[in-house]
């Protein structure tokens, strides 16, 4: 579920960035976009940290197995 939330937030940030480039917003729009991006990043950062804490031990455990298959 955390992965889904992170992907969703990344998609929102990408969509906002795309709209900034395509729509050429006014100054008021730029302030709203900056706040939206800041809010999305604040929400995505804790999720990314949780995913990292889970993924790192898995990667450490999988590395010797992968090395054994290759070597």
Curated annotation (Swiss-Prot):
Thermostable. Still active at 100 degrees Celsius. GO terms for cellular component: extracellular region. It comes from the Eukaryota. GO terms for biological process: defense response to bacterium; innate immune response; killing of cells of another organism. Keywords: Antibiotic, Antimicrobial, Cleavage on pair of basic residues, Cytolysis, Hemolysis, Immunity, Innate immunity, Secreted, Signal. Homomer of four to six subunits. Female-specific peptides with potent activity against Gram-positive and Gram-negative bacteria. They have as well hemolytic activity. This is Ceratotoxin-A. It comes from Ceratitis capitata (Mediterranean fruit fly). The gene is CTXA2.
């Amino acid at each position: 579920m955390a992965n889904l939330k992170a992907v969703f937030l990344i998609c929102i940030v990408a969509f906002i960035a795309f709209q900034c480039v395509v729509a050429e917003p006014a100054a008021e729009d730029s302030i709203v976009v900056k706040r939206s991006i800041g809010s999305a990043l604040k929400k995505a950062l804790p999720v990314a940290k949780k995913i990292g804490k889970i993924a790192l031990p898995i990667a450490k455990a999988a590395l010797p197995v992968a090395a054994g298959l290759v070597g």
